[in-house]
């Protein structure tokens, strides 16, 4: 026998659909958090603590995303079982999650301008102190070699950053092999600094641009998820009250 469609049954289906939107926004946040953690980890190795906030925001998005997915599932259960307590719990919890998401996005947008000022000096000093060379196994040197090769740059400001550094004192070279345009060429000897041999520009501004992109992606996506959740939770509350009245 076909199911009789009544306003009551339609309201239950609407509640289930709205909670599905809430769960989808949570999945978006989980993906965003994973991406933020992966990208933030690499940047933190190079830029240091000045970019560590990306990791923290990524962790926060991951946690909030998992909570939102659970709330969406709980809301769906509350709608199908007509549980007033479950629906009220989900609605109140979503309000808290929304506040956290908006706060996280605001912190990222406000904090980013400070990163450039703090990161430049910190990254410069750390590079001169901790960078060891092209084939060195330590994580710091490995990450910097990868950055210089992929971004086609040399040092923080330029190749002169290695002058007087621990790297030069240890190897006697003016720049590492990863600064060369062609790593296997004979002219890449650590002394020839001509534009045909090594990259003349530093990596800092390129790294800062990547950090800016990731920061705005995190904040924008977090606000986007918050809009979806705000819309969903609003109608969940209205429909839930009508259903359980």
Swiss-Prot record:
* Compartments where located: Membrane
**Topology relative to the membrane:** Multi-pass membrane protein
Domain of life of the organism encoding this protein: Eukaryota
Q: What is any Pfam family matched here?
A: Tetraspanin
Q: Which GO terms describe its cellular component?
A: membrane; plasma membrane
Those parts of the protein on the Cytoplasmic side are 1-13, 59, 116-245
Q: Where, by tissue, is this protein expressed?
A: Broadly expressed in most human tissues and cell lines including neural and bone marrow derived tissues.
Q: Which gene encodes it?
A: TSPAN16
Q: What is this organism's lineage? A: Eukaryota, Metazoa, Chordata, Craniata, Vertebrata
> What's the protein called, per UniProt?
Tetraspanin-16
Kindly give the Gene3D superfamilies that the UniProt entry links to this protein.
Tetraspanin
Tell me the first and last residues of the signal peptide.
none
User: Which loops or segments lie on the Extracellular side of the membrane, by the record?
Assistant: 35-37, 81-94
